[in-house]
């Protein structure tokens, strides 16, 4: 059994790691990585049980982070989308010497909604978990639709996300279940103030999974971080507003090179 994750590396320059979200795989970054590789050495990973990476045992959150760190460049900027943002944030907390800059996209230190904190309602997360047991392909497709919901170009966004995800093997059912548990249970809100490297938080104003209110909460938790809001984007701004996304990302990375 393989004990390593599938990575793609392209381009030359300073190292940049891209981490996908729940139910997805590294192919969602294809357009983004092609453009970024003109300026950076871009490393795209398939998390355990996703895409071309075999399920490396029933990994919990900390183990998933260790798996990515084990094969990531010695030092790099880390960019994580959605669930990938949680993984990148945890890597930056546990191994700050490895993460030169941290960028989270449509992500939150706590995805689950609770009193005084916006997020995904626990009931929705538990419904996804139940649906996984009966039809996990349909569950992933439903999640794709939720990601684009609110975007003016929702149909086109879903089409692009589906094309990318279905270009690689479907995710492992156990990996999907573990990912949902992470989204439901992990809470890094008290830890993020410890981050010492430059941090940029990117949001879609129309995001239904990470409500824009989270961006305002995070202003208080991380007053020294940068915040970028894509006004017409939903949960996948790098899909719906790719050129604008890359421009903002490059500006941040160049400012903190």
Swiss-Prot record:
Species this chain originates from: Aliivibrio fischeri (strain MJ11) (Vibrio fischeri)
Reactions mediated catalytically: 6-carboxyhexanoyl-[ACP] methyl ester + H2O = 6-carboxyhexanoyl-[ACP] + methanol + H(+)
Provide the binding site for substrate.
22, 82-83, 143-147, 235
Its keywords, alphabetically, are: Biotin biosynthesis, Cytoplasm, Hydrolase, Serine esterase
Question: GO biological process: any one?
Answer: biotin biosynthetic process
Name of encoding gene: bioH
Q: Does the keyword NAD apply?
A: no
| Broadest EC class assigned to this enzyme | hydrolase
* Record protein name field: Pimeloyl-[acyl-carrier protein] methyl ester esterase
Identify its protein family.
Belongs to the AB hydrolase superfamily. Carboxylesterase BioH family.
Summarize subunit and interaction data from the UniProt record for this chain. Monomer.
Which pathway does this chain act in? Cofactor biosynthesis; biotin biosynthesis
